[in-house]
Amino acid sequence: MIENRPWLTIFSHTMLILGIAVILFPLYVAFVAATLDKQEVYAAPMTLIPGTHLLENIHNIWVNGVGTNSAPFWRMLLNSFVMAFSITLGKITVSMLSAFAIVWFRFPLRNLFFWMIFITLMLPVEVRIFPTVEVIANLKMLDSYAGLTLPLMASATATFLFRQFFMTLPDELVEAARIDGASPMRFFCDIVFPLSKTNLAALFVITFIYGWNQYLWPLLIITDVDLGTTVAGIKGMIATGEGTTEWNSVMAAMLLTLIPPVVIVLVMQRAFVRGLVDSEK
């Protein structure tokens, strides 16, 4: 029997509302700043009432970019989308095939290979990133989409999650496929892949956001302004030294940068939650 405790209900709802307010208030301030002009945004204290310059600020960065030596912001959004989508597609493909080989194929040292992949989770990004940059430079892949995406396609986490899921599939599926004369790739495409759709949805959302939010990697790989990404571009808008930061333009760029991942999460919300729940069963 569940006791009805009004004070507990009031307390839990109050904490929930406070938590939502703490999360949403900075976003609201950013939205208000994006609607103001340069003079209004520097007023002390800054107003919390939205202004009328949102479209003007968006048009300014959309056409002129985020600085004097910058590509238009639409180009940065396109670069970020290409990078995030390529990383997502590559991670899922490589991880699924790697996990499939480790679980369903019998070859010497397969467990050793898995643990070699898994142990990379223990290495901080800072330990791996500069050797990776050196490899990319030696392969002449600086200032290219290949340099932006290929090194980030391997994922020990996704490989581990797919391996754990594949290990829950009954052996009868393999036996039935063998009796029907299905090849390994036919078994993968017709049976394993359809059963993995919920896991794919969860990993797609997580990996897309991971790729979209990349900051350090594009900063090290890209010097061509036409290949710049949004996150690195926004950081470049913040002036250093005696320069003045146009915070209204910065916040307008931030709002545009938020739109693609928010759309992905909203569109795939149900599949994302289902994938997380099913992966725990």
Curated annotation (Swiss-Prot):
GO biological process: transmembrane transport
Membrane topology, from the record: Multi-pass membrane protein
Boundaries of every ABC transmembrane type-1 domain copy: 77-268
Record's GO cellular component terms: plasma membrane
Sequence intervals crossing the membrane: 16-36, 85-105, 113-133, 142-162, 202-222, 247-267
Keywords, sorted A to Z: Cell inner membrane, Cell membrane, Membrane, Transmembrane, Transmembrane helix, Transport
InterPro entries associated with the record: MetI-like, MetI-like_sf
Compartments where found: Cell inner membrane
Pfam families: BPD_transp_1 (PF00528)
Superkingdom, natural source: Bacteria
Annotated family: Belongs to the binding-protein-dependent transport system permease family. UgpAE subfamily.
Self-association state and partner proteins as the record states: The complex is composed of two ATP-binding proteins (UgpC), two transmembrane proteins (UgpA and UgpE) and a solute-binding protein (UgpB).
Summary of the function given for this chain in its UniProt record: Part of the ABC transporter complex UgpBAEC involved in sn-glycerol-3-phosphate (G3P) import. Probably responsible for the translocation of the substrate across the membrane.
Protein name: sn-glycerol-3-phosphate transport system permease protein UgpE
